[in-house]
Structure formats: structure tokens, C-alpha cells
């Protein structure tokens, strides 16, 4: 059985780390963290790695997702941080965008349902990056799928995920933007249904409240969680986090 993952989140907007709340990107402010007095991505990632002993990071390049200039040079700097693994959602729209990231040495490339134009983008990524480096983010708002992909636009999460799995996807992220930054806590019944249905790895982002939440997801055989707000506001105790990450 694969190790349960706890992955810190870095949301980048205007080339600095921001505090994401409810997917309302026009209201995002620079991150204020108890861990580091900076909103500079390399500083924050380095500090988080050192204090949590977690060597993996999830990056959402919101500049790219919002169809602005992607943070290519910043990504290159982040990848020079010693012993760091990067999962990034850079707002992939078309298959041709995948090649822009295939040579970076990423741990995984994330395809968000919110941005991809069609399902063939997923198939192309599986071919280019391989199944172990391809992650599909099931982007939702209050459990309604966010997407422009015609085949799944009016479908529920369970039907959508079934289609995604049939393409050969082995890892998904359940990401409800409404829950982001709110520390709502608990496991939604929908997520438990997804866990029963989907045979691959499931990461969960948005709404993680505390260590107890993390332990619950681990107990229910999810593959990992993405943590942001509860880490940076001090709710998650570092000693307990390090302990659960080791076990």
C-alpha cells in the first residue's frame, strides 16, 4: 500500500503566494503565515519543507489558470530547491500546452477540469507524461463540476469520474473550490462514494480543518490531502503533522 500523502498547497497569483478562499480569486490577498514572514514562493516552499519535513508541494499557478502570463521562470527556481517534488496545475487548456511542462522534471502535471478544452487533453497527457505523472483535478463548486468540456458539462461528479477513469487516469484530486480556505472539516458523503467507485489514488483538497481531518481521510483509505490555511494559521501542530507524515 502506498504511503498516505500530506501535501502543502502553494497558490501563486501575481507571482506571489496568496491565501485562497472559496475560489473568489479577485479577492485573494498575499499569504500571511505563522511559519514565514514572506509571500515569496521560494522562501515559503523552502520554509514549509524544512519545518514539516514534507518534500512535496502542490502548486496552483493562478496566473496561468486565469490565462495571464504563466510563471515559467518562477517554476524553474522552485525546482532548484533541494529535495523538492512538484505537482503543478498550470491551467492546461490544450494538448499543446502539455509539452511546455514536459521537460521541467515535474513529479506530476495536474489537468484541471475547469480549464481543459476536451477529454482528449487527458489522453494526450497520459501518453506524454505517463499515468504516474498525470493527475486530473475534479474541480467543483459546492459539488457541481466546473468545466467547459461538453461530454461532462452537465454530469454529476460520480459519472464524470467514471469517464475519467475509463481514459486510464490513476490519480485524481477532489477539489471543491467553495471549501478552499474555510476549514469546513469532515468528509463529505460524496467523497466516500467516490472512494468506493474509483480504483486509483484520490487526493483531497479544500476544507481540511485539523490533524483529526487528516487522520479521518487516512482511515477511510484516501491517498492523501492538500493542506493550506490550517497549516499557515497554526491550527495544524507541526509536531503532530510530522508524526502522521512519518507513519
Where are the language model's segments positioned?
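N-terminal active-site wall of soluble small-molecule enzyme domains
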Residues: 50-104, 188
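Glycine-rich phosphate-binding active-site loops on the catalytic face of alpha/beta enzymes
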Residues: 104-121, 176-179, 206-213, 220-240
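Hydrophobic faces of well-ordered beta-strands that scaffold small-molecule active sites
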Residues: 5-12, 57-59, 86-90, 109-111, ...
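Short, acidic/polar
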Residues: 36-50, 94-99, 152-163, 214
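Charged helix-capping and loop-helix junction motifs
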Residues: 69-76, 150-159, 184-192
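Conserved anion-binding
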Residues: 8, 12-32, 102, 106-180
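N-terminal beta-alpha supersecondary unit
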Residues: 21-63
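Catalytic cores of alpha/beta
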Residues: 81, 86-108, 190-224
Amino acid at each position: 500500500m502506498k504511503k498516505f500523502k500530506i501535501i502543502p498547497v502553494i497558490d501563486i497569483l501575481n507571482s506571489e503566494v496568496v491565501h485562497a478562499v472559496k475560489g473568489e480569486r479577485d479577492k485573494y490577498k498575499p499569504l500571511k503565515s505563522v511559519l514565514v514572514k514572506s509571500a515569496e514562493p521560494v522562501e515559503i516552499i523552502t520554509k514549509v519543507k524544512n519545518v514539516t519535513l514534507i518534500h512535496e508541494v502542490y502548486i496552483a499557478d493562478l496566473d496561468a489558470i486565469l490565462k495571464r502570463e504563466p510563471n515559467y521562470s518562477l517554476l524553474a527556481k522552485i525546482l532548484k530547491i533541494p529535495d523538492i517534488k512538484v505537482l503543478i496545475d498550470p491551467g492546461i487548456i490544450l494538448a499543446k500546452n502539455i509539452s511546455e511542462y514536459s521537460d521541467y522534471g515535474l513529479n506530476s502535471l495536474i489537468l484541471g477540469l475547469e480549464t481543459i478544452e476536451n477529454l482528449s487533453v487527458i489522453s494526450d497527457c497520459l501518453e506524454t507524461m505517463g499515468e504516474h505523472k498525470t493527475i486530473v483535478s475534479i474541480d467543483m463548486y459546492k459539488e457541481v463540476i466546473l468545466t467547459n468540456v461538453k461530454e461532462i458539462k452537465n454530469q454529476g461528479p460520480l459519472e464524470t469520474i467514471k469517464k475519467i477513469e475509463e481514459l486510464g487516469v490513476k490519480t485524481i484530486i477532489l477539489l471543491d473550490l467553495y471549501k478552499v480556505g474555510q476549514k469546513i472539516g469532515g468528509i463529505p458523503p460524496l467523497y466516500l462514494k467516490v472512494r468506493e467507485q474509483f480504483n486509483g489514488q484520490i487526493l483531497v483538497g479544500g476544507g481540511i480543518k485539523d490533524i483529526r481531518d487528516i487522520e479521518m481521510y487516512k482511515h477511510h483509505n484516501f491517498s492523501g490531502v492538500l493542506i493550506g490555511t490550517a497549516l499557515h494559521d497554526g491550527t495544524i501542530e507541526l509536531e503532530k503533522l510530522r508524526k502522521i507524515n512519518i507513519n
